[in-house]
A protein has these predicted regions:
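N-terminal signal peptide c-region/cleavage motif recognized by signal peptidases
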Residues: 17-22
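Extracytoplasmic small-molecule ligand-binding "clamshell" domains
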Residues: 25-107, 250
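Periplasmic-binding protein-like
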Residues: 36-38, 117-121, 193-234, 253-262
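Ligand-binding cleft/hinge of the Venus flytrap
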Residues: 44-48, 61-70, 113-115, 135-173, ...
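Extended ligand-binding regions for polar small-molecule ligands
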Residues: 55-67, 127-129, 147-149, 214-254
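Short helices/loops that flank or line small-molecule/ion binding pockets
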Residues: 66, 76, 81-93, 165-188, ...
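A ligand-binding cleft/hinge motif common to bilobed small-molecule-binding domains
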Residues: 98-107, 178-208
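Flexible hinge/capping segments at coil-to-helix
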Residues: 124-143, 224
Length: 265
């Protein structure tokens, strides 16, 4: 039987003792959320129900909505741009993986504190001798990023690879000196493909940004009460270390799913 960390139970119990005032105070009794569908351990499609998203971000929001007496649906809507469009339109209430920028501020109310930092880190071959104290030590070396990754840096020599697995194999063949990729995403992907033990992560990160919950301006559920409750609950959960615990649990969940044979139609 899988052991569940007692910290999670304690924190969720604390949340569930909050008064269930949602029906009396809020505008709605159901929240619909979405996000990028291919970003484990934060979010990915449920293999048992592909119309639904699962992952650490979904689990975190479920803990919050349960404590507020709200129903929650976390739906698959497509890739990052499609998910944002569905939230922007108000057809979906909440974006689970919003990063702060001017364009999104025009259509979303960001919840503070953030869910987690998204750290772009350098991954190198698991061998001694790579001297690294920061981003400047990568100058002049051959780097790889995954196609579609938003990271750019004019001071680094970066080529694109179709996916993280191919980038990592190029690294292991010494066709590149490092790969840049988000920390948790790389652990999930490489762990599921059996490549994680072949590489090592360099610290400090090359870049970092925050991932937030964000409520659509045009959502029927968007009101001061809900925004305030989301901020309060996020503050409590962050202080208790729950987001990090959920990330660890969902890394294992993703890896377990990858080890199972695919179902035949």
């Amino acid at each position: 039987m899988r052991r569940v960390h007692p910290l999670k139970f304690a924190c969720l119990a604390l949340l569930l003792t909050a008064p269930l005032t949602a029906f009396a105070v809020g505008k709605c009794d159901r929240v619909i959320a979405t996000g990028a569908a291919d970003n484990p351990p934060f979010l990915w499609r449920d293999p048992e129900n592909p119309k639904r998203l699962i992952g650490a971000s979904a689990d975190l929001l479920k803990a919050i909505t349960d404590s507020l007496g709200l129903k929650l649906e976390v739906l698959y809507t497509g890739g990052p741009s499609k998910a944002l469009e569905e939230v922007r339109s108000g057809r979906v209430d909440l974006l689970l993986d919003a990063t702060l920028d001017v364009e999104k501020l025009a259509v979303l109310d960001f919840v503070h504190p953030p869910v987690a930092p998204l750290q772009t880190v350098a991954w190198v071959r698991h061998e001694p001798g790579f001297l690294y104290a920061g981003r400047d030590d990568l100058a002049g070396l051959r780097g790889l990023v995954v196609k579609g990754d938003s990271f750019t840096d004019a001071g680094l020599q970066l080529r694109t690879a179709p996916d993280l697995a191919q980038a990592t194999r190029s690294l292991l063949k010494q066709e590149a000196d490092y790969v840049l990729h988000e920390r948790y995403s790389a652990v999930a992907r490489l762990g599921g493909q059996g490549l994680l033990d072949e590489v090592q992560r360099l610290e400090p990160p090359v870049a970092s940004r925050e991932m937030h919950l964000a409520v659509a301006h045009d959502s029927a559920c968007n009101d001061p009460w809900l925004r305030g409750q989301l901020a309060i609950k996020m503050t409590e959960l962050r202080a208790a270390g729950v987001p990090r615990q959920l990330l660890s649990e969902n890394l294992l969940r993703w890896r377990d799913q990858q080890s199972k044979p695919a179902k035949t139609p």
